[in-house]
């Protein structure tokens, strides 16, 4: 059984005004195995973000099914979705999605706080991750006090701290300069070597080249 299975996904949006329909996804099929590093390639407007939103259970498909460890996401009640995402999925976004009023440490802690973890437990989980990502010295700083590369490392730490089954990365190098992008991609390589499954959405050929395999326009 694959870790993630996608069967016949279709997504159609209908405009509120005029009832015009736009098809964002059509018959998308693929699977991701435990420990794989997979890139979904495509230009802007090709449906990559729509697909990622469905995989993250932030949106529902018009047709088709997504299964994580054999469980269909369509079976999960709306009231359970937030907890399901926290427990199973890690997210890395292009624009970091860090809260400026929270320190780097507290930003990383946020999914654990929402899960009701104690402060001591959170610190125990953070220590090895911060060491691996090289962010021990910036934990007490705020997002506006650190570089873009450091912000993205903090975002990666937040994604990893819940020990997710899969990390979903949406254009993770999009807001970074060339050097910071290279550093982040090397970091993803290292994280993947520990067994972490990564699914990355990108339009960058260079970023996609770090993955085991690519899923391109023929599928998305």
Q: Which residues are covered by each model-predicted region?
A:
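Conserved small/polar residues in nucleotide/adenosyl-binding loops
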Residues: 218-220
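ABC family nucleotide-binding domain
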Residues: 3-4, 9-214
């Amino acid at each position: 059984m694959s870790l993630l299975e996608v069967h016949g996904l279709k997504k159609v949006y209908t405009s509120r005004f005029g009832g015009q329909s736009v098809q964002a996804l059509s018959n998308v099929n693929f699977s991701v195995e435990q420990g794989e590093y997979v890139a979904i390639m495509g230009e802007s407007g090709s449906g990559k973000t729509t697909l990622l939103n469905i995989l993250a259970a932030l949106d529902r498909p018009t047709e088709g099914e997504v299964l994580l460890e054999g469980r269909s996401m369509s079976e999960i009640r709306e009231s359970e979705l937030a907890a399901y995402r926290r427990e199973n999925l890690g997210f890395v976004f292009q624009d970091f999605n860090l809260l400026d009023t929270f320190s780097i440490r507290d930003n990383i802690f946020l999914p654990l706080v929402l899960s009701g973890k104690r402060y001591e437990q959170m610190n125990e989980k953070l220590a090895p991750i911060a060491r691996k990502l090289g962010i021990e010295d910036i934990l007490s700083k705020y997002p506006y006090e650190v570089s873009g590369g450091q912000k993205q490392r903090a975002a990666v730490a937040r994604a990893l701290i819940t020990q997710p089954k899969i990390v979903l990365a949406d254009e993770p190098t999009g807001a970074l300069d060339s050097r910071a992008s290279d550093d982040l991609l090397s970091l993803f390589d290292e994280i993947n070597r520990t067994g972490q499954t990564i699914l990355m959405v990108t339009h960058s050929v260079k970023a996609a080249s770090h993955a085991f395999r690519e899923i391109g326009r023929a599928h998305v």
